[in-house]
From Swiss-Prot:
Amino acid composition bias (Basic and acidic residues), ranges on this chain: 81-99
Record gene name: zipA
Lineage: Bacteria, Pseudomonadati, Pseudomonadota, Gammaproteobacteria, Pseudomonadales
NCBIfam families per the UniProt record, alphabetical: septum_zipA (TIGR02205)
One of the protein's GO biological processes: FtsZ-dependent cytokinesis
Compartment(s) of residence: Cell inner membrane
Residue segments, region Disordered: 65-141
Protein name (database record): Cell division protein ZipA
Amino acid sequence: MDIGLREWLIVIGLIVIAGILFDGWRRMRGGKGKLKFKLDRSFANLPDDDGDSAELLGPARVVEHREPSFDEQDLPSVSARETKERKGGKRQEEPRQGDLDLDEGLALEADPSDAAEPVEPRKGKSKGRKEKEREKAPAVAAEPAPVDEVLIINVIARDESGFKGPALLQNILESGLRFGDMDIFHRHESMAGNGEILFSMANAVKPGTFDLDDIDNFSTRAVSFFLGLPGPRHPKQAFDVMVAAARKLAHELNGELKDEQRSVLTAQTIEHYRQRIIDHERRSLMQKR
């Protein structure tokens, strides 16, 4: 069979292509082998002291080896093993220095039972102190000062539907009242709800409380602001804050201010309330004398 020039060129081209593919495949395999070899050499450079997992802490030893760079002697001779041995020596010496217990972790490693013993009496003492404070606290709370007078300002809704819960809640929160004891709202010295109670606000409709869980469906025809005497340290200032909160509620939610007799609250009635506060303070001073 005669083979022409065309057939020879095809055969030679196939051989060249096969050679190129084989050479590329060989180089790729050779490259992978070199990469693995380099990785293995990087791990082979680690110290051969121990075969434990602690040897993986190479970065920590490098940092510790650089820290003594301020020393003037034996910098090249410092090795990771020597620094580790020095640290181990310090850990063995510290528990022997006495009952200082400067390091709680070292004390636990030396003897866990000894370290647990001094902790228990401290807890017992703290519990005993807390129990004593709790015993004293109810004794103080169980003897509230008797209230001689109560100043009341009622806010009655003009709309038959009354004050809606969400709008009422938003209004009184802006005035600094916070939900608290007896399921009613209280105004403290701080707007955040801290300090003594200046005055309170209750629901004027039975049962006289508020249900925050159902505030979206809540409504009432009237609310009552009240301030007891004796009460806050500065009753006149507290009364002014109460009047401002009641006026804000009546103005924004279409309410009407009433006194304790459900009569219209006039400027003269407010001055009468202030005079009652002054008279009460005067009587209190007379009794103290």
